[in-house]
Amino acid sequence: MGADARPLGVRAGGGGRGAARPGTSSRALPPPLPPLSFLLLLLAAPGARAAGYETCPMVHPDMLNVHLVAHTHDDVGWLKTVDQYFYGIHNDVQHAGVQYILDSVISSLLVEPTRRFIYVEIAFFSRWWHQQTNATQEVVRDLVRQGRLEFANGGWVMNDEAATHYGAIIDQMTLGLRFLEDTFGKDGRPRVAWHIDPFGHSREQASLFAQMGFDGLFFGRLDYQDKRVREENLGLEQVWRASASLKPPAADLFTSVLPNIYNPPEKLCWDTLCADKPFVEDRRSPEYNAEELVNYFLQLATAQGQHFRTNHTIMTMGSDFQYENANMWFRNLDRLIQLVNAQQQANGSRVNVLYSTPACYLWELNKANLTWSVKQDDFFPYADGPHQFWSGYFSSRPALKRYERLSYNFLQVCNQLEALAGPAANVGPYGSGDSAPLNQAMAVLQHHDAVSGTSKQHVADDYARQLAAGWDPCEVLLSNALARLSGSKEDFTYCRNLNVSVCPLSQTAKNFQVTIYNPLGRKIDWMVRLPVSKHGFVVRDPNGTVVPSDVVILPSSDGQELLFPASVPALGFSIYSVSQVPGQRPHAHKPQPRSQRPWSRVLAIQNEHIRARFDPDTGLLVEMENLDQNLLLPVRQAFYWYNASVGNNLSTQVSGAYIFRPNQEKPLMVSHWAQTRLVKTPLVQEVHQNFSAWCSQVVRLYRGQRHLELEWTVGPIPVGDGWGKEIISRFDTVLETKGLFYTDSNGREILERRRDYRPTWKLNQTETVAGNYYPVNSRIYIRDGNMQLTVLTDRSQGGSSLRDGSMELMVHRRLLKDDGRGVGEALLEDGLGRWVRGRHLVLLDKVRTAATGHRLQAEKEVLTPQVVLAPGGGAPYHLKVAPRKQFSGLRRELPPSVHLLTLARWDQKTLLLRLEHQFAVGEDSGNLSSPVTLDLTDLFSAFTITYLQETTLVANQLRASASRLKWTPNTGPTPLPSPSRLDPATITLQPMEIRTFLASVQWEEHG
């Protein structure tokens, strides 16, 4: 079905080929579950074995085996909210009810023992499971044991791969796979990753899947040029070498591209949402079509098989929210299998068709013992036509993208304090604290229509609602934990609106205390900014010593903020006290308009490490200097906008939530000059730039800071002229970059990008802007032989280098047309999402030392300190223990190359611990890219580790007993992985290695 003729609620290229518009066809109710006695009798039949490859069906080694995969693709929010999809509400928007799909599938599987089905989205399945009776649950467990109901992927959602951070990916996969492990044991453990709908595929995602223990990956969306080449060269299946640092085969993943995205073949969609004809076998009927369908299928299977290297091929039989009447699907598949296989006897057909699963198909490929080609880059950007690059969603809904990243930060703080404080965090003086709601909400946000920004507006609003609801019980947990660890029960306040300078307590109280929690494994020095009233203030550190402070008037406001530097220990907190000075009005530092006097035309800000100079005529940044490394780089930064395409003579494709398609290659400047104001205090220097009524920026240097901070504010983007606009921040330099630039992959490893180039095929570039855009999750940089300019982001954005020495990041977009990919509404964001604030951190370094700066600063950007306020004067938590104003959960800091990725409660007496080497091989010219050894025995101060078990990345298998299928790449044999030592709690981390542990602990009595 083409992009301009698809049923409502079907993404172009996605589900529902041949589907009728929902709501227009009559549909039978799914059959009820058979009586329990019948089910138990059926399941007691001989031949039921433990789930695993041994439960796979028999194949014919001398025939073409067509593996039919019955499946449903259930978006965890898209056109409807998660709840609306589960319960089947608002079927006028899209006919979809997940609870009925699962009811119907289970019922139909029990009718015929050869039938198989896979399910993916655990966010839905877990909800359905908890609504079932014990008897039904046992029936399902038996189906899983027999391999007839099989889970693929197993994450809470099928996450996006462009706008997601690797930590959040790991968390959501852990949540879903833990449910399966707790519910079904090893029988329910998925063996393949199933990412059939994400709009492009990242290398880091493949690396994580390999480290999670998956044997292979199946996906559906592949660039149309890439797919054509792979079909011709039999390259749809290969080994993906997904890490440049981890030794093969640690991050090697067998990868298979599905032949029809994830849809059934043309004419073979037998769902109530489809309009294809069912099998009619009665030759007397004028509708008789059985012979025609069988012949069509044989031709189809033979043609498809020619694109693959073995005598096995796979067909997906299902699509978006299908199988609500599973009997309709399975009855026709039964007939297809019977009639096609009958041709083997009737006329010597060499095609064998069978119910199968992706895992069973993969098993047959593995047994073929072939040598496979190797891929080492990624699958971005994705295009499904010459002018249809799916690179717009890298930047869509920037406010939601930032809220998701903030929530990841807060969830890690919540998890850590729950681990450090022990059971007291969950039940304490502030009520019942719980990290689970935010963990689940964050998992939902990783869905490929959530953080991607590709849902309807009301669904995006619901995603934000889920996050907000998850923050509440985490705040209770933080209060309980901080009270226990500090020894003082305070009236804690959480100011969620500090980004817009709103915090009622700090703006009204004469005295208050500020608790700053540091989630990193090293001490940090951090500048605190709090909105305050028009008074003078004195700030004291945990020892009672007065620390420097400033009051700064806010731009475009009569409000003001208090600034003071805080030092916070590793994995711990410091409590500072703030007091008004009676009778003293503040000496507030107001922004000063730039002088027009000829002898004062230098506009610059500077600290000990960085100097930034601005053009006094235009107000634009024009030069950056690293004083420590004696580097000076002319760099011009300004805001531009692309005029969004509404279609032209080359293509009717418009820019939308998914698609980025500008009208012209050259963007327009928001303004050629900025009205500027200068702020200089002992703690901070700022240049406030006002480009227009809807675009402004503060360029900032704090004392001691080694990067330049650009805090931009964009919106509401004006569209009254009838043009959608896509706003970028662009940096132009004199660096000779030779068409190269570099972006991160999900916040971890770095990939080299070359303009107008793809490593695995000769690109025919049809969109010189959109076709060169890539996801930027945490950083983008350009460099020559000496200097490197890096920009760190505070959320996922799209970015590129469209000419040598230049790089750009898209910060916001507002569009007037729907791009024809199923959402059915333009990306207008008429609510608060129109006004967005964010930060870019700019680093200038020598190439050989740049990694130290951007790695350590990016870590700080993802896990920033959590600020909690209180009036002070709280009651003691322990009557016999004095309160403390400083605490560290570590007895010694982690080395700079080691990141504490996860510290979270697993059960009542067990913690989940992940430690990560955050540098790549050869990335640092010093020793930060070297292996590092840690002793975990007495590392933590709040608890003692009594027993330690190492697991796979998602903690669903012991590492020592986990195994994966072995493949032979054409690069030569890979060495057997050497076992990682744990002796008894001393571990070594190799570059880019993550090691995961379940630690039995005993908490200290008073923390």
UniProtKB/Swiss-Prot annotation:
Signal peptide boundaries: 1-50
Cofactor(s) of this protein: Zn(2+)
Disulfide cross-links: C56-C360, C269-C274, C414-C474, C495-C503
InterPro entries according to UniProt: Gal_mutarotase_sf_dom, GH38_C, Glyco_hydro/deAcase_b/a-brl, Glyco_hydro_38_C, Glyco_hydro_38_cen, Glyco_hydro_38_cen_sf, Glyco_hydro_38_N, Glyco_hydro_38_N_sf
Glycosylation-annotated residues: N134, N311, N347, N369, N499, N543, N643, N649, N690, N764, N927
One of the record's GO molecular function terms: alpha-mannosidase activity
Catalysed transformations (reactions): Hydrolysis of terminal, non-reducing alpha-D-mannose residues in alpha-D-mannosides
Post-translational modification summary for this protein: Processed into 3 peptides of 72 kDa, 41 kDa and 12 kDa.
Residues forming the catalytic site: D197
Major location category of this protein: other
Superkingdom to which the source organism belongs: Eukaryota
Biased composition (Low complexity): 1-10, 19-28
A single GO BP: mannose metabolic process
Entry binding sites for Zn(2+): H73, D75, D197, H448
Subcellular location: Lysosome
GO cellular component terms attached to this protein's record: lysosome
Disease implication from the record: Defects in MAN2B1 are the cause of lysosomal alpha-mannosidosis (AM). AM is a lysosomal storage disease characterized by accumulation of unbranched oligosaccharide chains.
Chain's role: Necessary for the catabolism of N-linked carbohydrates released during glycoprotein turnover.
PANTHER family on file: ALPHA-MANNOSIDASE, LYSOSOMAL ALPHA-MANNOSIDASE
Protein's name in the database: Lysosomal alpha-mannosidase
Organism for this UniProt entry: Felis catus
